[in-house]
Amino acid sequence: MLAPSVPESRYRRAVFWREQSVQVGRDKLAGRLYAPAAVPDEAGLVVHLHGGTFDSGTLASGEAVATTLAEAGAIVISLPYPLAPANPFPQALEATYAALEKIARDKARWVGKSAPLYVAGEEAGGNLAAALAMMARDRHGPPLAGQILFSPMLDACLGTYSFRNAEAGPVGCRWADGWHAYLGSPEKAAHPYATPVNAARLSGLAPALIVTAEDDLLRDESINYAGRLKAAGVDTTIRVVGGPSRWPEAFAEIPRDGSCLCSACDHISAFFTATAPS
């Protein structure tokens, strides 16, 4: 049964969701399928990973971003993933990559066979989406039309100006604790799949849309990663929306008319158009 997502009046397209499980080996990931009431003929399929700090986050907290992706004109499968510290790196990444492969094989269940496939995520989910793009390249996996990263957690050092300058207070500890829970030991931070911003080889990745905000404490690592992708020859679009955005905390809230998440919908729609098969 389809349930309405956030109130229709706040969106150009009504968006609905239903439960959608993905069977991966012996495991079943209980996710959600988001779809516009009127699905565009050219709709792509987005595998979305919710936010949090690797040790937190749920499908419900990812609803606003998943809805925004669907409102931009895509079918979205939003997936949970194993949380740290019980499941340290690379367990969440391997689980989501297996799900990505399964979804790619079964893509015709939801969209046309030639429809583009994307990965997307916010915060820790943005980290996983960026790493999935690397894995798909390295393992000759599902061909991706693009990666959409909202304020991704990419740098475990937490030393950027935007992070240090943010009035984070105790929030700063939450990010450090999340990284510690995910990595387990410092040497794992050197792995490119764990901290994509430090990867030595970025060429050959799917086109990227990276969205951050002026007052986002993850702004600088988002911009740094976009710059490194561009230098490696990856077709990359970086969008810095105006503040106050209250990103990334606001990702878990219902977007309101004129909010930064609603304005990001236009950037996503443009990215879908630019990366659609010709």
Where are these regions (language model features)?
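Alpha/beta-hydrolase superfamily serine-hydrolase fold, recognizing
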Residues: S5-S278
